[in-house]
Amino acid sequence: HVLDGVTPMELWRDYGLTSYNMATSSETLGMTEQILKLSAQTHKPKLAVIDVYYIDKPDDLEWTYSYRHLFFDAVPLSFAKFDAVRASLPQNEWLEFMMPFSLYHSRWEELLSGQSARLVDCEPFMMGSEMRIGRGAPLAYTRTHEMTADELPGEAALRRIIAYCRANDIEPVLMALPAPVSEQEQMNMNRAQLLADELNVPFLNLFDEETGIDFETDCYDYLGHMNPDGAAKL
């Protein structure tokens, strides 16, 4: 949801903030940790905003592995990249992510011709965000402020992310973007408030902010990914 909901160029235009959207699709918090560490080697931010949508997901979800190419394929070969791949993927996946040409070697003609489908609609001037036009009928939605009682799989990674930020003079901020998700998914994200209070970290729970978001008009699909109208409101 962050790919579509946070537009760096609007932050620059409206507030003079320079930023980059480093989000990927189906991103576990363990993967977020590795993205932050590798990105900070190129440019250390003053502030890192961490989305908590997948706070309930463990890092070893096999169906999320393919999405990790969105980040790792752009990272040059290095010991740091190997450490990140090793920390976030099982050993049988390491070669594919360290040497991605083994995955694409039969597709060069398709890629060079420009006929291949793009997984992310992102241009350089969009600073990592994507823009998808359209409107989709959202899922049924009822707001809840309850919290999941038990600790969730992503909390350990969140703690490590916050510790890394503080050790490297980066201000950590947690965030939940509004979407027509189930009450259980909301309860999971609401639980991030407990961690934020414990560690004295800001938590922007935009489900409760007066953003003016209308899921009927501001989403391009039923899952609540924002179209440009929705992203502008966030």
Label the predicted regions.
Residues 22-25, 51-53, 175-179, 206-209:
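Active-site-proximal beta-strand/loop segments in catalytic clefts of secreted hydrolases
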Residues 2-84:
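Membrane-embedded segments
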Residues 16-18, 44-47, 166-173, 199-202:
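Loop/turn elements at helix/coil->beta-strand transitions in domains of secreted/extracellular proteins
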Residues 187-234:
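C-terminal regions of proteins
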Residues 26-30, 149-154, 180-188:
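Acidic-and-aromatic substrate-binding clefts and catalytic sites of carbohydrate-active enzymes
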Residues 19-24, 146, 150, 223:
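Acidic/histidine-rich helix-loop elements
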Residues 12, 165, 195-196:
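A generic structural signal for well-ordered alpha-helical segments
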Residues 65-170:
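Secreted/periplasmic serine-hydrolase-like ester/acetyl group-modifying domain
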